[in-house]
């Protein structure tokens, strides 16, 4: 069987943890940040865990993670 290809766009967006979960960036932290509070911006700068309902799709896109 041939090797599976990794979707490079997904590989740049998601990182696997040691336990097999995937981490992602939060939305709403790219631009238009003036009216957002410091607390919100600090929260948005942290990583989030990919929801378990989406984890299977991410795993298919990054087979060797």
Swiss-Prot record:
UniProt-recorded name of the protein: Large ribosomal subunit protein bL35
For the keyword Cell cycle, the answer is no
Presence of the UniProt keyword Ribosomal protein in the record: yes
What Pfam families does the database record attribute to this sequence? Ribosomal_L35p
Q: What keywords tag this UniProt record?
A: Ribonucleoprotein, Ribosomal protein
Output the superkingdom of the source species: Bacteria
> GO CC: one term?
cytosolic large ribosomal subunit
User: What molecular functions are annotated in GO for this chain?
Assistant: structural constituent of ribosome
Family, per entry: Belongs to the bacterial ribosomal protein bL35 family.
Q: Which SUPFAM superfamilies match?
A: L35p-like
Give the species this sequence originates from.
Prochlorococcus marinus (strain MIT 9312)
Gene Ontology biological process = translation
């Amino acid at each position: 069987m041939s090797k599976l290809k990794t979707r490079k766009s997904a590989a740049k967006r998601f990182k696997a943890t040691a336990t097999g979960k995937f981490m992602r960036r939060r939305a709403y932290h790219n631009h238009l940040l003036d009216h957002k509070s410091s607390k919100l911006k600090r929260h948005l700068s942290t990583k989030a865990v990919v929801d378990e309902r989406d984890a299977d799709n991410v795993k298919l896109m990054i087979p060797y993670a």
